[in-house]
Swiss-Prot record:
Protein's gene: der
MF term (GO), any: ribosome binding
List of residues binding GTP 2: 182-189, 229-233, 294-297
One Pfam family per UniProt: MMR_HSR1
Lineage top rank: taxon: Bacteria
Biological function: GTPase that plays an essential role in the late steps of ribosome biogenesis.
This protein's record includes keyword Nucleotide-binding: yes
Sequence positions that bind GTP 1: 10-17, 57-61, 119-122
Keywords: GTP-binding, Nucleotide-binding, Repeat, Ribosome biogenesis
Identification of the protein by name: GTPase Der
GO BP annotation list: ribosome biogenesis
Domain KH-like: 352-436
Family, similarity comment: Belongs to the TRAFAC class TrmE-Era-EngA-EngB-Septin-like GTPase superfamily. EngA (Der) GTPase family.
Length: 436
C-alpha cells in the first residue's frame, strides 16, 4: 500500500533541501553500475522509528522565470495535491517575512496537516526568537538546525502523528494491479480505453487511495485486474502540466500501488531523456515491468524496423534488460490483445519461489563455470544461498566477506538465475551476508 507522503514547503533559502537530505540520508544515493540511469532527487524514501514514508522536496521544482509569489503558490500547490502532511519551513534568522505569510495563507486553506519548522536555530540562545512564528497560525513552531541536525527527531515525531491509517484497497489478493506510466501524450489514456473496449467492463470506477488516480477493475478469461490510471487526472496549472518533474511525482504514486508497471513509449517520436528517468523509477521500485511501444501504426517500417527499435530500447534502458517489449497501437487496437498475457507472465515471475536445494545447485554450478573473484589476495567464497522474499525475488548469499562480491559477479549470478528459472519482467535482488 502507498506510504504516507511528507512535503517540505517554504519560500526560497529557508533550507528545504538541507532538511530533505538530512531526513533521507543515504537513501538519496543510487547504487547502479549502468551509466545513463539518471535520478531526480525531488522525491525519496525516508524512515523514522519504524514509520516509512516518502518525502517531496518542493525546492527541487524549477518554475523558471515566473514571478516570485507565483513560484511560491505553485510550489505549495504541489504539496497540497500530493502530501498527507506538510512541513512548512521558515528561517529563524530572518523572522516572519511577507513571503512566509503568503505561504501560510495557502496552506491554511488546504485543510492538510501542517507542521511548522523554524530552521537555522543553531544554538539554544536562538530559541527565544521563535515565538513570533506562532502568528502564522499553525501552533507550536519546532526549532531545528539543518546544518547540525538538531530538532529533527521532534519534528518527525509530530509529522508521524498525522500519517493516515493504512487501509486495504478492497481488492482480492489474486487481483493483478497494473499501472501505465510515461511522459505526457504517449497514449496512456488511449491504451486504457483500448484495453477496456475489448473486454467485458465492470462498470464502476473506484476512487483509489492515491489522490488523482482512478482505479478501473475489469476481468478477462476469469482473471481480475485493476488498472491504476494516472492519465485521467484533473488539469493542473499550465506550468506544472508541462513540467516533467510533476509527471514523475504522479507516476511514482501509481507505481507504489502496482504489481506490474507498464512503461509506455511513443513509437513515433522515439526515446528521450525523460523516458529514461521514468523507466528508472519503475526499475527502482522492484515491481514487475513491461515496456510498451505505442503508436506503432504511425511508424514507417520494413521487416527490420521492429528489431532496430528494440535494440535502441535495450541500448537506452540497459537497467531494464529483463523487461519484455510489446509493440502495439492503442489507436487501431492492433496487437493490444498481446499485452494482457505478458502482464500475466511477468506477474507470475515476480512471485516465483525457488526451493533452497535447487537454488544452491544452480549457484554452485555457476561458481564451477566462472570461479569467484579475488581482491587483494582474498577470494570470495560462497557457502550457500536462500530465497528470503518474492515481489521481487530476493536472495541472500552467505559468503566469507560481503565486500568481495563485485557487482560484475553479482550480475553474472543474476544472469544464471534468469537462465535457470526465467524471471521474465522482474528484477532480482541479491544480498551478500557474512556467514556467522
Amino acid at each position: 500500500m502507498p506510504k504516507p507522503v511528507i512535503a517540505i514547503v517554504g519560500r526560497p533559502n529557508v533550507g528545504k533541501s538541507t532538511i530533505f537530505n538530512r531526513i533521507v540520508g543515504e537513501r538519496v544515493s543510487i547504487v547502479e553500475d549502468i551509466p545513463g540511469v539518471t535520478r531526480d532527487r525531488i522525491y525519496s524514501a525516508g524512515e523514522w522509528l519504524n514509520h516509512e514514508f516518502n518525502i517531496i522536496d518542493t525546492g527541487g521544482i524549477d518554475i523558471g522565470d515566473e514571478p516570485f509569489l507565483t513560484q511560491i503558490r505553485q510550489q505549495a500547490e504541489v504539496a497540497i495535491d500530493e502530501a498527507d502532511v506538510i512541513i512548512f519551513m521558515t528561517n529563524g534568522r530572518d523572522g516572519v517575512t511577507a513571503a512566509d505569510e503568503e505561504v501560510a495563507k495557502i496552506l491554511y486553506r488546504s485543510n492538510k496537516p501542517v507542521v511548522l519548522a523554524v530552521n537555522k536555530v543553531d544554538n539554544p540562545e536562538m530559541r527565544s526568537d521563535i515565538y513570533d512564528f506562532y502568528a502564522l497560525g499553525f501552533g507550536e513552531p519546532f526549532p531545528i538546525s539543518g546544518t547540525h541536525g538538531l530538532g529533527l527527531g521532534d519534528l518527525l515525531d509530530e509529522a508521524a502523528q498525522h500519517f493516515p491509517k493504512i487501509e486495504e484497497d478492497g481488492y482480492d489478493e489474486d487481483t493483478i494491479r497494473f499501472s501505465l506510466i510515461g511522459r505526457p501524450n504517449v497514449g496512456k489514456s488511449s491504451l486504457v480505453n483500448a484495453l477496456l473496449g475489448q473486454e467485458r467492463v465492470i462498470v464502476s470506477n473506484v476512487a483509489g487511495t492515491t489522490r488523482d488516480a482512478v482505479d478501473t477493475p475489469y476481468s478477462k478469461d476469469g482473471k481480475d485486474y485493476v488498472i491504476i490510471d494516472t492519465a485521467g487526472m484533473r488539469k493542473k496549472g499550465k506550468v506544472y502540466e508541462s513540467t516533467e518533474k510533476y509527471s514523475v511525482l504522479r507516476a511514482l504514486r501509481a507505481i507504489e500501488r502496482s504489481d506490474v508497471v507498464l512503461v509506455v513509449l511513443d513509437g513515433e517520436e522515439g526515446i528521450i531523456e525523460q523516458d529514461k528517468k521514468i523507466a528508472g523509477y519503475a526499475h527502482d521500485s522492484g515491481r514487475a515491468v513491461v515496456i510498451v511501444v505505442n503508436k506503432w501504426d504511425a511508424v514507417k517500417k520494413d521487416e527490420k524496423t521492429m528489431k532496430a527499435f528494440e535494440e535502441n530500447i535495450r541500448a537506452h534502458f540497459q537497467f531494464l534488460d529483463y523487461a519484455p517489449i510489446v509493440f502495439l497501437s492503442a489507436k487501431t487496437r492492433k496487437r493490444t490483445q498481446t499485452l494482457i498475457p505478458v502482464i500475466d507472465e511477468v506477474n507470475e515471475s515476480h512471485s516465483i519461489r525457488i526451493q533452497t536445494n535447487v537454488l544452491n545447485d544452480v549457484i554452485m554450478d555457476a561458481v564451477a563455470m566462472n570461479p569467484t573473484p579475488t581482491h587483494n589476495g582474498s577470494r570470495l567464497k560462497i557457502f550457500y544461498a536462500t530465497q528470503v522474499a518474492v515481489k521481487p525475488p530476493t536472495f541472500v548469499v552467505f559468503v566469507n566477506d560481503p565486500e568481495l562480491l563485485h557487482f560484475s559477479y553479482e550480475r553474472f549470478l543474476k544472469n544464471r538465475l534468469r537462465e535457470s528459472f526465467g524471471f521474465v519482467g522482474t528484477p532480482i535482488h541479491i544480498i551478500a551476508r557474512a556467514r556467522d
